[in-house]
Amino acid sequence: MKPDFEKGDGLLTTVVTDADTKDVLMVAWMNAESYQRTLASGQTWFWSRSRQELWHKGATSGNLQDVVSMTLDCDQDTLLVAVHPHGPACHTGHTSCFFNPVELEQGA
């Protein structure tokens, strides 16, 4: 099965998890080139929407992500990537980019 890059204007939403803990580490985007580089290198590559450039995760910080598995969703437009991280996924130094709780309104 191949990803469908047409649905998301050339980008796949990519959910990255820790292969051992199953924790969600981050959400990023892949285009066709970053997808191919990820397959070829065994490490995560993404497309930076803000910088409009390819991004080898951890190349600067040393917090690389070794790919263990990649799974497409049923619509082939979202990718789940399980990794062995070499450090925190978040640029803030947190293990995961998801560390800001949202308070729910009571009775909502």
From Swiss-Prot:
Subunit structure: Homodimer.
Protein name: Phosphoribosyl-AMP cyclohydrolase
Family: Belongs to the PRA-CH family.
SUPFAM superfamilies: HisI-like
Chain sites annotated for binding Zn(2+): 74, 90, 97
A Pfam family per the record: PRA-CH
Protein encoded by which gene: hisI
Lineage: Bacteria, Bacillati, Bacillota, Bacilli, Lactobacillales
GO CC terms: cytoplasm
Species of origin: Lactiplantibacillus plantarum (strain ATCC BAA-793 / NCIMB 8826 / WCFS1) (Lactobacillus plantarum)
Domain of life: Bacteria
Gene Ontology process terms (BP): L-histidine biosynthetic process
